[in-house]
Regions:
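Extracellular/lumen-exposed scaffold segments
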Residues: 20-176
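Bacterial N-terminal signal peptides
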Residues: 6-16
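N-terminal secretory signal peptides that target proteins for export/translocation
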Residues: 1-4
């Protein structure tokens, strides 16, 4: 009888710890990030792309100059082929107070335009694109997204993604 009661206690502890692990995992899903591929600009030899970040209520993501707190988003290409340079662009941000600290960033949804400069438009672009950022609500959480890029620039067509990326690009301050 004693062993059976110990077994029940252990079973209850295991079940409660696994439900905590699931709820912690669910809390991690405060955002969604997607890579959008747009059209190829053959005059300037770049692929227009974007990282779209959709945030849950009350979550924010920082701008390139976050203010007194926070870290700006950044892009890193890993094992990339046929790319000479990548420019991550930032649409005009909003001003927020985070624990009485002035910060700059975005809420709800943002597309960060990318200009991916191509060495040879007749060759495939492929590799890994890594997006790093920090999102905040009551706390700040670093995020990392890995995207695979396989794209043939010369075959690009205008798509819904192109229109959305161009809208975001039009919101980038002209100092870029």
């Amino acid at each position: 009888l004693l062993n059976l009661s110990k077994l029940w206690v252990i079973l209850i502890l295991i079940l409660s710890s696994s439900s905590q692990a699931n709820s912690l995992n669910e809390n991690k899903l405060n955002y969604r990030a997607d890579l959008l591929l747009g059209n190829f600009n053959d005059k300037q030899n770049y692929l227009l792309a974007g990282v779209k970040v959709k945030l849950d209520n009350n979550w924010k993501i920082y701008w390139k100059n976050p203010g007194e707190a926070g870290l700006p988003p950044k892009i890193i290409f890993d094992k990339i082929s046929n790319v000479s340079n990548v420019n991550l662009l930032f649409p005009e941000p909003k001003s927020f107070k985070f624990f009485n600290i002035d910060t700059f960033g975005y809420d709800k949804e943002i597309i960060f335009p990318l200009k991916i400069y191509v060495k040879n438009p007749e060759k495939m672009i492929f590799g890994n694109l890594k997006f790093y950022a920090q999102i905040c609500n009551q706390i700040c959480v670093p995020i990392e997204e890995n995207f695979k890029l396989n794209y043939f620039p010369i075959n690009s067509q205008i798509s819904n993604s192109s229109l959305k990326i161009n809208e975001a690009l039009n919101k980038v301050p002209k100092l870029y």
